Amino acid sequence: MPQYRSRTSTHGRNMAGARALWRATGIKEEDFGKPIIAVANSFTQFVPGHVHLREVGKLVAEEIEACGAIAKEFNTIAVDDGIAMGHGGMLYSLPSRDIIADSVEYMCNAHTADALICISNCDKITPGMLMAALRLNIPTVFVSGGPMEAGKVRLTDGTARKVDLIDSMIAAGNSAVSSEDLERYERSSCPTCGSCSGMFTANSMNCLTEALGLSLPGNGTVLATHTARKKLFLDGAKRIVELTRRFYEQDDVSALPRSIATFAAFENAMVLDIAMGGSTNTVLHLLAAAREAEVNFTMADIDRLSRGVPCLCKVAPSTEKYHVEDVHRAGGVFSILGELNRIGLINDHCLTVHAPNMAEALKKEDIVSPQVTEEALTRCYAAPGGIPTIEPYSQSARWESLDDDRVDGCIRGGEHAYSKDGGLAILFGNIAQDGCIVKTAGVDESVWCFTGPARIFHSQDEACDAILADQIKAGDVVLIRYEGPKGGPGMQEMLYPTSFLKSKGLGKACALITDGRFSGGTSGLSIGHCSPEAAQGGAIGLVEEGDLIEIDIPNRLLQVKLSDAQLAERRQAMLARGNEAFKPVGRQRVVSKALQAYAALTTSAAEGAVRNLEQIHIKRD
């Protein structure tokens, strides 16, 4: 029988000093011997997805203690990718994932916590906490802060529609949008607390924790403002106490994250991601999480899965019609999983934190299942309140009806899929030998095959300036390099270049290729994560202005129209530059010591941009 980890610091004569300190945190004599559960919060006033989490942390901690355990809360950092976007702040976003993972490990191991509940939400926080949970392998439940309500804007010409953050960015670059209308977009796009309302990175990852089995149903789709979210937090607190007792008091290893997040569970998460056209960033994060779990889940597996999964759900930014609140009305993640299971694409034997296995969970949680529970149906009626607020679970609006239309609704059945090809695809070729990724759900099928001249840029700032100055024309392939994990460093998101292409009416007329990455809010022919990156000697660094680039999504191909001999000749010329080989030309960028340390240890996007300590070389005399 495993022993509570916390006994290390709470029992024995030699731990009198530690117990004295525990008492100073509020622990009473009768509490010693209870499990200590770490509440990893990520409250910050910088991020709308996290601005409400101070109250949530208190709620969760109180419920844990009501269930007979000790709750000890701490906070991690949280970077808002939208605020950090378009300037040097974006260099810090992806590196923050490792800082978050490390901080959770440090706190849990330093204080011998027995279990962990993760109150995450936005882009790098859920992945960072997921990496930590799988690294620690102690009982863990994820309860995210929940998605933001979609905004509603009425423009000066009287037109009205739903909007999100990306609409403001596109409008800003469109000179045809008046200053008054731009202000209306700005004031309407982000009306409440929560993670931005489309199927962007934050919501994608919070949905994927459901498919992995590490969070409760509704985690990815119940709105932050709705009272149903409060129940989810309370249920999560109860569940972590149950899992903790199961492992330590019943020797039930099925309560551990690595027993739940197996290879088959990672397949389920990726299949969901492909079917719902999730953010391309999820590929980075799933690869990184799998590595922490010691699961051999690779780009080859993602490529294999992407070729056989249809697109069953389209949400902003891939369509203006639906946002995450609409996915919830249609049954949420478990209804997408249910449709995938009906066509044989889900490993339903996988464990979850809330049901014996995925098969049992699907029976109860899929709203079109004959055995769906009343609780699941009630949860899916949770609707947006339409009132701007940063208060959590502050409204209880209900949809008049659920969307169970699997022919023309938000979620489709296999026979009525949006497309037989899923929403994400891995491409390979002579400038992406280790692969790259495109969100096909957001690409108009008319440009799935595209050839055009390369326009070369060594920073996204340079590319944005060219786009806004009308130097990019229809048919061009904008190629931004030296923005990968090492080359940036930090692998910046390219949301502004893609948004500005749309602003200029070029969203379906140009392609953008990078060894950097894209925001979950990106759509259009945007291909990222080209590996190896330019800074590591990748052939993307050998492309020259005007070279023809061929993109063939159906055949999973990305290449520059040059022979192997021509590329070899260019490589020799590049290497002849010595210390300046495979470095950006003319770019002025201050790189802090923190980012230099990240660059020294990080790996390729094809490996999840995780750290590889083998890259440390110690000089010895």
UniProtKB/Swiss-Prot annotation:
Which residues hold Mg(2+)? Answer: 81, 123-124, 493
According to UniProt, the name of this protein is Dihydroxy-acid dehydratase
Gene this protein is translated from: ilvD
Read off the NCBIfam families from this record. ilvD, PRK12448.1
Entry's Gene Ontology molecular function annotations: 2 iron, 2 sulfur cluster binding; dihydroxy-acid dehydratase activity; magnesium ion binding
Recorded metabolic or biological pathway in which this protein acts: Amino-acid biosynthesis; L-isoleucine biosynthesis; L-isoleucine from 2-oxobutanoate: step 3/4; Amino-acid biosynthesis; L-valine biosynthesis; L-valine from pyruvate: step 3/4
HAMAP family in the cross-refs: IlvD
**Cofactor(s) for this UniProt protein:** [2Fe-2S] cluster; Mg(2+)
UniProt modified residues of type N6-carboxylysine: 124
Q: Which organism is the protein's source?
A: Magnetococcus marinus (strain ATCC BAA-1437 / JCM 17883 / MC-1)
- Cofactor binding, per record: Binds 1 [2Fe-2S] cluster per subunit. This cluster acts as a Lewis acid cofactor.
Give residues annotated as binding [2Fe-2S] cluster.
Answer: 122, 196
Q: Does the keyword RNA-binding apply?
A: no
